[in-house]
Amino acid sequence: MRRLGFACVVAVLMYTLAPIRAQSVYPTGTTIYEPARAWNGYTVLSPLQTQAVLVIDMNGNVVKRWEGLNNSAGGPARVLPGGILISASGARPPNQESLELVQQDFDGKVIWQFSHNEQIKTGEGSTIWSARQHHDWQRESLPAGYYSPESAPVVEGTSTLILTHTNRMQPKVADVMLEDDRLVEVSWKGELLWEWVASDHIDELGFAPDARKAIKAAQSFNKARGSFDWLHINSAHYVGPNRWFDQGDMRFAPNNVIISSREASLLAIVGRDGKIVWRLGPDFSESKELRSIRQIIGQHHAHIIPKGLPGAGNLLVFDNGGSSGYGFASPIAPDGVGAFARSTSRVVEINPVTLELVWSYTNPRFFSTNISSAQRLPNGNTLITAGAGGRMFEVTTEGAIVWEYMYPLFGGANASNAVYRGYRIPYGWIPQITRPTERAVAPPALGDFRVP
């Protein structure tokens, strides 16, 4: 890994001295809406502090709400055609994981559930089955997890890819108990079809000696959990049908899985034989192409844009910023953990074969230190969830904001309105609801905005 010297010091100053641009009073709900330029539909929200999944229309009205679900540990909720919901349920604090993945119909009737992954001890000492699911899951027929004109989501009888935890010792990684990341693919009946455990493949992940040393030291061991969340994989998607595979590049086989490791600043594709067949990061100084992309830090929601959408076949990533990565000791990372830092976020679209940076969105005031997502829409716009602040917005390829929404419900000890992810779906996917009227929202000029 290249020693960045002065650049690292600049990063430290930017991160530690950057002003916090968070006003105490601001409007919530839909604050900008241009119906003619937006891709109109319902938006599915996975709020962290609300034990429910919400669906809103373009004007921010709640049109559907499923209660008793746990977005804070299990991650994204998704709605499939017919008003079918799949979401996590049940928490296991202090572990960031859910007890089960549940599929419900529009009225809340359970159609499918998965929990038989591992047996765990509850706080009361009893033993129960748990999915140990965290951060992500995918249905085989909806590889990127969201709508495309060429997608045909299968509601029942299909397999599911689930990102889970498993605790294990692996001396090649560290000399403490790992909270390891394990991918499982299960049938509709809950049978294990395929699995992959991250720590078995540490030698394939591109870590330099300094990074391996920092990981081995395990300074981020979580005493409350009794384990070391060394990679913190936060997304796992099927690659899905794509032009690269059509042209003969087997790395992009549709049933391969693309993963994102927040802690390592690493993205990789896992082949069905378990081997890493493609990798981006962790060190973005390794080549001219990577230096052009620039270091990705603390990223979320890495996936291949599905066929049928503008940019199909390219990689789309919410690059959070904050700090992440393992490497050499520095003022910001005396133990080599969190070696890279940046105080702004960006969304990047990358050609995964040439590593060309195709498109990006950023702004000096755009920053979500964790969670968050980006979805490519059929009209070429991108729906961005800056999750830490509960903000969702739709931007054109030129960066114009044509829809913006601030989640209005606050909860938890920190009075947070954070939203893990948001997804835009067609109106027709929830036929039980009458299509709403779309009303433009033109915000006042900031200089004219006053609280009475």
Place the predicted regions along the sequence by residue.
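Bacterial N-terminal signal peptides
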Residues: G5-P19
